[in-house]
Amino acid sequence: MSIISFVYFDLGGVVIRDLTIDENAWSRMKRDLGVPPSFDQEFDAYYDKIELLVQAGADIDSFLPEMAQKFHLTFPIGYSVLTDLTSRFHKNESIWPVIDAAKKIGKIGLLTNTYPCLLDKIKQANLLPAVAWDVIIDSSIEGTQKPEARIYEIATERAGVAPEEIFFIDDRPKNLAAAERVGWQTFLYDPRHAEESSQHLMLQFMHA
């Protein structure tokens, strides 16, 4: 293995268990919102479109009126997508020893496509390990997101090491492919087999 001086972790699907851990989790959320199965495809396309805007800094809850009108939904007073999502997330304690191991061989950071204020909600829910991240790259703050080249340029600069010394853990192949194009080392994490993925990472870091 090449030298590792900095490890970037993805947030959802790696450091925490989000809706990717269960193929039915997103469907359950849609049913809870009142989206009928017959509208699934249309709702998914709509959500994918607005999510790109949200991950670049737009407020997800600002889309609720449009969402309600478009899909004939009724949201409770005070409803927040951020709060709802956070309540459906869980700790991924299998990754915690991996983060500790990474901290021993270099610096660590988060590199995440996320929504404004969602990381704060996740912290408040105590879903993260008690660790001091050296760098946090939040797409909603940077205005660019994975797999766009710019976010990897920013992350490389803030890591302060050569690109080939950066190790990146993510659960989406397209994000890893973009990282490899700038010279990073990568690992594809499987959120549906988190314990197994974490064990493989531990073995790699033990020999780093």
What does each of the following model-derived ranges do?
Residues 1-45, 181-182:
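Active-site neighborhood of HAD-like aspartate-dependent phosphohydrolases
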Residues 10-13, 56-57, 102, 110, ...:
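Generic structural signal for small/hydrophobic residues in well-ordered secondary structure
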Residues 49-81:
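A metal-dependent, Asp-based hydrolase signature
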Residues 76-109, 149:
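Short, acidic loop-to-helix structural element flanking the phosphoryl-transfer center
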